[in-house]
Amino acid sequence: MADAPAPAGGRGGFRGGFGGRGRGRGRGRGRGRGRGRGAKDGDKEWVPVTKLGRLVKDMKIKTLEEIYLFSLPIKEFEIIDFFLGDALKDEVLKIMPVQKQTRAGQRTRFKAFVAIGDYNGHVGLGVKCSKEVATAIRGAIILAKLSVVPVRRGYWGNKIGKPHTVPCKVTGKCGSVLVRLIPAPRGTGIVSAPVPKKLLAMAGIDDCYTSARGQTATLGNFAKATYAAIAATYSYLTPDLWRETVFTKSPYQEYTDYLAKHHGRGAVTAHPTEEKPF
């Protein structure tokens, strides 16, 4: 009888729940099962659910830049994995607990900030809140992939070698934090606080001066302002890009027939309503 309440406590408890039935084994099993599930998802073939995903998988769109050229929204993180793959590196910037006051007391969740980039012109930032740290990090990585933007790089002086810095001064703002990126000569390195330094390095910028003002201790806003500044490198045209624009068809327009023929749900049964008498 002494052991009778244990299952109820184990099932309903928060701290000791589930771990009550074999504490060490339960914890290890949970971790292992999580990893195994992730591995299965990795091995599973990607089945795209958006038109853009279908065009990417069928190799109709061959580069990420084609997507950015037409400002097509990316709704599947597998598209980023398809193009950038192993080149992508992610880093957890911060995990912070956040609380909400409820009738029952305080509900604590964990907020994760994750930066992602290929160190060669692509960078993203993801923020996710969840009950568990691992879930928050996983969600933040997915959101970071969906927010990947191209980075335009330029020169400080003469155009010798590969572009190494930002093309000109750019500014990003989030909350009270304002971040300014200033071109720097080759060999300077990234002169900045640790948070922008990680994002700029992941974006593939080798040399850069930075200036920040506002409440930079708020890491989330500091990271978002830096991300906005990096994204702003493609928001203007410099005189060397004042060429006449040649308009081309969007991939959706170009491959309309292909999408309708191969992937349309109503492609097999054409006009089923015509056969039914009313």
UniProtKB/Swiss-Prot annotation:
The keyword Ribosomal protein applies. GO terms for cellular component: cytosolic small ribosomal subunit. Residues 22-37 have a biased composition (Basic residues). GO terms for biological process: translation. Keywords: Ribonucleoprotein, Ribosomal protein. It comes from the Eukaryota. Residues 1-43 are annotated as: Disordered. One of its GO terms (molecular function) is RNA binding. Residues 88-151 form the S5 DRBM domain. The keyword ATP-binding does not apply. Belongs to the universal ribosomal protein uS5 family. NCBIfam families: uS5_euk_arch (TIGR01020). Component of the ribosome, a large ribonucleoprotein complex responsible for the synthesis of proteins in the cell. The small ribosomal subunit (SSU) binds messenger RNAs (mRNAs) and translates the encoded message by selecting cognate aminoacyl-transfer RNA (tRNA) molecules. The large subunit (LSU) contains the ribosomal catalytic site termed the peptidyl transferase center (PTC), which catalyzes the formation of peptide bonds, thereby polymerizing the amino acids delivered by tRNAs into a polypeptide chain. This is Small ribosomal subunit protein uS5. It comes from Urechis caupo (Innkeeper worm).
